[in-house]
Each structure stands twice: as structure tokens, then as C-alpha cells.
Amino acid sequence: MTAFLDTSVLLAGLIDFGPQSGPAQSIMHAVVERRLPKVSTAWHCCLEFYSVATRLPSEFRLTPADGALLLEEEVFARLTVHDLPAADRLRLLQAAAQDGTAGGRIYDAHIAEVARAADAGVIVTDNRRHFLAALRHGIRVETPTEFLRTIKTRRS
């Protein structure tokens, strides 16, 4: 099963925001320790990580150089980074229009479609409701805490 990490998991997994970062950090530790063999994300999530991480409040903010380095060493070196295949782009827009997807929700629809194209079995996110459209493709949507429970159960 391929786990697909959303931006929220990358952020909390790589930047310590306190106790709420714990589950995402546990997932990233499992990636480092190779306990999760198939983990991926979207190129868009990498861009979103960089955008958010370099404009956080000063106590958490990364410099642009540190943001790029963290992505290089922790994401590109350990995860498979996918983009939406060109052949799927128009279909995404058509489906979004048909579903009434408006505003910034198009970005979540894009990420969900990248996860589908990457054959993800689960999207791990702190924003479950943003990815409910993925359910129609048979992709589970779990919070980091739920995902940790799932992988613990599978190992037992």
C-alpha cells in the first residue's frame, strides 16, 4: 500500500510545532527508518510546504535556503514525488467543474487526483474533509493518528 502524505503532514512532520506535531513526526521517523516502504507526495505539496514554511511566524519560519534543503534531504531523498500526468489535467478540471469545486478547493482536488494517479491506498492529512473526493476512487483518507493506528494494527 502506498501512503500519500499531504502538505499538513510534511509541515508537522518536519517542523516541530509542539505536541500536535507528534503523529506526523512519528510518520516521518517511520519513513527514515524504512518501516514504510512506499511513501509518496505531490510536487504541489512540496511547493506548498516551501510557501508555508518560509512565511510561518518567526519562531517556526524557515529561510528559503533551509526550506529547499529540508525538502531535498527529507522529501526528495526519501519519498516519491509525483505530479499529475498531462493526460489527466483536463479531466481534473472537468470533474471539478461538474462537482462545483470552487476557489482553493481546486488545489486539494489536484492533490487527490495526483494521489489517485500514483495508485495511493491512503492519503494522510490533517485536513480530512478537504480530501473526501478521494474516497470515490477507493483511496482511504486518514489523519496521522489514524494512519499510525492502521500501520500498527497491520504489523500486529
Label every model-predicted segment.
Residues 1-41, 56-69, 149-156:
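Short, well-structured N-terminal submotif of metal-dependent ribonuclease cores
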Residues 6, 104-105, 127, 139-156:
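Histidine- and aromatic-rich ligand-binding microenvironments
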Residues 8-9, 44, 110, 129, ...:
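Alpha-helix/helix-capping structural signal
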Residues 38, 80, 138-140:
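Conserved beta-strand segments of alpha/beta enzyme cores
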